[in-house]
Amino acid sequence: MRKRVPDAGLSLVVAVVLLLITMPAGSLASPPAAQESQGLFVPVPAPQGEAPEIAAQPAVIRSRLVEVDLSLLAGSSPRRLALNLFDDVVLDVDLQEAEPLPDAGQAWRGRIEGEELSQVVLVRRGDLLAGDVFLPGAVYRVRSTGGGLHAVSQIDQSALPPEMEPVPVPVPPAPVDQPHDVTAQAPADDGSIIDVLVVYTPAARQAAGSTAAMLAEIDLAVADANVSYENSLVSQRLHLVRAVEVSYVESGSVSGSPGDLQYLQGSSDPYLNNVHSLRDSYGADAVVLIVHYPSPVYCGVAYQLAENVEAGFAPYAFAVVELTCATSNLTFGHELGHNMGANHDWFVNVSLDRHSYSHGYFNTQDRWRTMMSYNDV
């Protein structure tokens, strides 16, 4: 059942996520050495182990192809794992108990030993693994490339496009008071579970490599956001109600007059109108469209909840996310943060229309940021 999208609590959630470390890769320090243990990744010798199409991506510092020893992820109990990302980056990770996902999938979360400000999220879907590794000074990504192989990449977030400024919504007319029987109303839920419908384009699925890889990316995006809430001791969680491919070709702009966001939100144009019926069928609070542009200008955009539109915001709880940025740049959680009323960091947005805690934050000295901040540390 669709709920009214909360504002203050979620603004706080997104704004105080201090444990998602997303520093520029240029500040990479020597990572802690792993103990002697079997690594998750099995190197693939050249030339099969080379992935020039991945290495050519602007935000990729380096990459290599590997096989994944999935036997190390059998079961769901907590464990220690060696992430041998590269020859010079081998990390001991303490994983908590895996969370079950649909279709027998699993989501693992953990931290690197000796790095308090680190985060590891791994999602398994059959023989596919998708993962993000954040630690002070570096971001790493693991994605399937098909044929039983996976690419391990080091990501330079500063080379990714910026997030677009959120789109304000029209102020609705004041509601007219109507007599009603309060006792007859169903009790409202506490708002701690945010139901999200994710739709994606054929271009996004093709860029991901397959439908299974696309679904793993979506699972990872949700898991990344939920781990950030957990790290901040916030009880709220995202719940993926459905992930569906839609027949839609990117308009050329994630937002404009109109753009992808406006086509997603609108119900009177000829585009994406089935999304509204899907939203109603699955009771989604918010809807995210994942797109892919060969040379994206922005990582994403969303409508922003404002204090004067809280009661009438449901028709605007929509966001558009570029696949390239969805997880490694935390854009999925970032754009949903705008739906929840959060702003960019104070250096980008000085608006006081929400709460003092509903802005992104970055630490210039230690070079880390929260998900609502720009990559300007």
Task: Tell me the role of every PLM-derived stretch.
Residues 126, 191, 283, 314, ...:
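Short, solvent-exposed loop/turn segments at the edges of secondary structure
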Residues 1-8:
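N-terminal secretory signal peptides that target proteins for export/translocation
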Residues 36-47, 51, 151-308:
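Fold-level signature of zinc-dependent metallopeptidase catalytic domains
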Residues 10-20, 26-146, 266-267:
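N-terminal prosegments of processed precursors
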Residues 244-262, 312-377:
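The catalytic-center signature of Zn2+-dependent metalloproteases
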Residues 97-98, 121-127, 136-153, 209, ...:
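Surface-exposed flexible segments
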Residues 112, 134, 198-203, 241-244, ...:
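Active-site-proximal beta-strand/loop segments in catalytic clefts of secreted hydrolases
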Residues 79, 108, 129, 194, ...:
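Residue-level detector of short, conserved catalytic/binding motifs and their immediate flanks
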